């Protein structure tokens, strides 16, 4: 016969530790184990792109450890906001999305979205960031970042092309204008194909863009020169080049961050379990090498830190967009 003992603070602490050590294989004593069915992975970008490739890489490996397949659904359009709007409709704790943070931190200021970025979506796990390359075309005679600043102080100015109005690169241009007072002229494109063609044809001075195959090819051909990069550290591909942060332009030293997201009604236990699985994979040399081959830097973060980073970027972007007079289009 077991004699019942009164609950003491020590007993409660021991019980809590025991529950924590038991893992997160169940959401609670009364609920079914998680995951209990295939996991739906929304990628708000076209099939075959970097976001799609990375989402499938993680899905294949996490399916092995979690015991349920990942079913990828590509739902591109409207700056990835269509896919994110689809995400918030789910309430089964088995639906996630993968992509850039811009549909949460930037796009809501520039276009109508069918969700509140901070209330309807829960950041789950940061995966990686991609630096922005500051590239000079053959139209720009200078060789260094100092040459860029010197020309920006003249009436000639410096034309800076980006992949579009309201993009991260556009925000960088506005930050450079504010930091230097220089004559930087933004040249926004719609899509990448014409941008690549005009970069090869030297139709502007500078180009701000994340590294990807066509850009890398133009660099190898000598039609583009990398003057600087962005990020908390120099990317492995360009260790000899300074970041904009090193050059004294912290507010323009921006990167494209990517991660996993869930509807805000997803149980915290599930969010934490998913984050732990992502961090486990990011700690492996195989995953690190695969991401670096795609010109991305692994960037694991806790749920709390990833959430805080997104909230911070959302607030900062709102202030800058208002001051720069960037309007929704």
Q: Which sequence ranges carry the predicted segments?
A:
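C-terminal lobe and pocket-closing loops
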Residues: 129, 214-283, 315
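N-terminal twin-arginine translocation
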Residues: 2-14, 18-33
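An extracytoplasmic/periplasmic, membrane-proximal ligand-sensing/linker region
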Residues: 36-38, 220, 246, 268-329
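Immediate post-signal peptide segment of exported/extracytoplasmic ligand-binding proteins
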Residues: 27-41, 91-94, 149-158, 220-223, ...
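N-terminal (or domain-start) structured segment
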Residues: 30-120, 165, 169, 181-208, ...
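Ligand-binding pocket segment of bilobal, Venus flytrap-like solute-binding proteins
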Residues: 159-165, 169-241
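Hinge/capping helix and adjacent helix->loop/strand transition within the periplasmic-binding protein
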Residues: 89-94, 109-194, 244, 257-290
């Amino acid at each position: 016969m077991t004699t019942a003992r009164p609950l003491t603070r020590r007993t409660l602490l021991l019980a809590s530790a025991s529950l924590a050590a038991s893992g997160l294989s169940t959401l609670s004593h009364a609920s079914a184990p998680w995951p209990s069915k295939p996991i739906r992975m929304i990628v708000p970008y076209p099939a075959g792109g970097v976001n799609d490739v990375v989402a499938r890489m993680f899905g294949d490996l996490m399916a092995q450890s979690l015991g349920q397949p990942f079913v990828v659904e590509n739902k591109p359009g409207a700056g990835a906001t269509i896919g994110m709007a689809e995400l918030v409709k789910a309430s089964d704790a088995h639906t996630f999305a993968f992509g850039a943070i811009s549909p949460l931190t930037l796009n809501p200021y520039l276009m109508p979205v069918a969700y509140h970025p901070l209330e309807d979506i829960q950041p789950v796990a940061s995966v990686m960031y991609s630096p922005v390359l500051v590239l000079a075309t053959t139209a720009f005679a200078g060789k260094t970042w100092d040459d860029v600043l010197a020309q920006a102080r003249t009436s000639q100015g410096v034309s800076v092309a980006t992949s579009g109005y309201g993009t991260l690169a556009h925000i960088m241009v506005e930050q450079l204008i504010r930091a230097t007072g220089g004559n930087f002229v933004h040249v926004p494109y719609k899509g990448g194909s014409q941008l690549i063609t005009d970069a090869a044809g030297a139709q502007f001075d500078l180009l701000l863009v994340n590294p990807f195959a066509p850009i890398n090819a133009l660099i190898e051909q000598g039609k583009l020169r990398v003057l600087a990069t962005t990020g908390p550290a120099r990317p492995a591909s360009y260790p000899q080049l300074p970041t904009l942060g090193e050059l004294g332009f912290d507010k323009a030293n921006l990167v494209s961050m990517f991660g996993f997201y869930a509807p805000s009604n997803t149980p915290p236990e599930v969010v934490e379990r998913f984050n732990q699985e992502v961090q486990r994979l990011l700690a492996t040399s195989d995953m690190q090498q695969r991401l670096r081959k795609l010109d991305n830097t692994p960037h694991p973060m806790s749920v709390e830190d990833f959430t805080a980073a997104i909230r911070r970027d959302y607030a900062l972007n709102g202030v800058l967009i208002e001051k720069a007079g960037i309007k929704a289009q």
